[in-house]
């Protein structure tokens, strides 16, 4: 599993995390231009910025998926004894990428607020751009710092879930169709907050998994997101366990790994018949040659 994690990290690279850090710094510092805001409220405003999350963070998360969306070769899969074991361990492993992205963002946001006065209260100046959102969050969280922690953890889990969903889509449809499906889902996420007609439809897209306050619009919205996510998880688990990789040969090997894989590939009926024909041919040739010599 460690080797698989290293491979996916190498495929992913660290350029996206650097881009996230730079973009997050720019977005966060621009939020300081309003002035008159405490440190805790500043970091909460940065981590909950709809435009930053929708048009910058979400594309980076989706682009990260395509670094490891393809299945590994059969020799790698056979090391895990079953396909569902391979998929689950790969999904758990790419969680490290979600942790790195979240840690980079958190570090950038915390750095951007250096120098601001401390004030872990909800009192906000009238007319502030965050007033509408903060008035909603004030009813759910005891302090801005608590809300910041919850938003960060939700984004971490949401990124990991998006990775798994994209991997699942990628297996069934292939990279070409996965790109099209992901683009459609992203467009739906991007226009969701702009079109009230779409908000009234009980749909769950990437934005609901990544942005916590997108689940606060309607009383039933958290239930819709939770039910859809549960349905997705059950579908993924069922398909991984019973339906996935049905076209591959079901190997029943006492040992697993590269040696077992190549033994299976070499010991086919065709190869065995060829081997027997060669042995019989050599035997007959030697026998006939020995008889002629006598």
Predicted segments with their positions:
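Hydrophobic alpha-helical transmembrane segments
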Residues: 1-68, 171-172, 176-177, 190-214, ...
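Secretory targeting signals
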Residues: 25-67, 88-175, 207-227, 291-293
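Nucleotide-cofactor and metal-assisted catalytic machinery
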Residues: 144-145, 152, 183-194, 293-294
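Juxtamembrane non-transmembrane "cap" segments at the membrane-aqueous interface
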Residues: 117-129, 187-204
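A residue-level signal for alpha-helical anchor/packing sites in multi-pass solute transporters
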Residues: 72-73, 168
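Residue-level recognition of membrane-helix boundary sites in multi-pass small-molecule transporters
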Residues: 85, 177-178
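Hydrophobic core positions of alpha-helical segments in small-molecule transporters
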Residues: 89, 181-182
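Short helix-to-coil transition segments within interhelical loops
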Residues: 77-84
């Amino acid at each position: 599993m460690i080797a698989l994690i290293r491979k996916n990290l190498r495929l992913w690279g660290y350029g996206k995390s650097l881009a996230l850090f730079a973009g997050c710094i720019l977005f966060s510092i621009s939020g300081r231009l309003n002035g008159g805001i405490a440190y805790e409220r500043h970091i909460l405003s940065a981590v909950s910025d709809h435009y930053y999350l929708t048009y910058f963070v979400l594309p980076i998360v989706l682009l990260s998926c395509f670094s490891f969306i393809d299945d590994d070769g059969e020799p790698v899969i056979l090391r895990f004894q079953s396909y569902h074991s391979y998929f689950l361990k790969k999904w758990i492993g790419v969680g490290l990428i979600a942790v790195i992205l979240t840690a980079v963002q958190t570090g950038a946001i915390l750095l951007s607020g250096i120098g601001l006065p401390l004030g872990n209260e909800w009192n906000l100046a009238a007319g502030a751009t965050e007033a509408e959102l903060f008035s909603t969050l004030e009813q759910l969280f005891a302090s801005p710092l608590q809300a910041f922690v919850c938003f960060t953890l939700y984004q971490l889990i949401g990124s990991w879930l998006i990775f798994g969903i994209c991997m699942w889509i990628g297996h069934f449809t292939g990279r070409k169709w996965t790109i099209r499906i992901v683009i459609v889902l992203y467009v739906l996420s991007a226009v969701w907050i702009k079109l009230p007609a779409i908000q009234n439809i009980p749909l769950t897209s990437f934005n609901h998994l990544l942005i916590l306050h997108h689940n606060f619009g309607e009383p039933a919205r958290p239930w819709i997101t939770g039910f859809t996510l549960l349905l997705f998880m059950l579908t993924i688990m069922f398909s991984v366990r019973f339906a996935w990789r049905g076209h591959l040969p079901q190997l029943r090997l006492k040992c697993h790994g590269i040696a077992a894989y190549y033994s299976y590939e070499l010991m086919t009926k065709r190869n065995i018949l060829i081997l027997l024909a060669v042995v019989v041919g050599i035997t007959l040739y030697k026998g006939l040659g020995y008889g002629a010599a006598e």
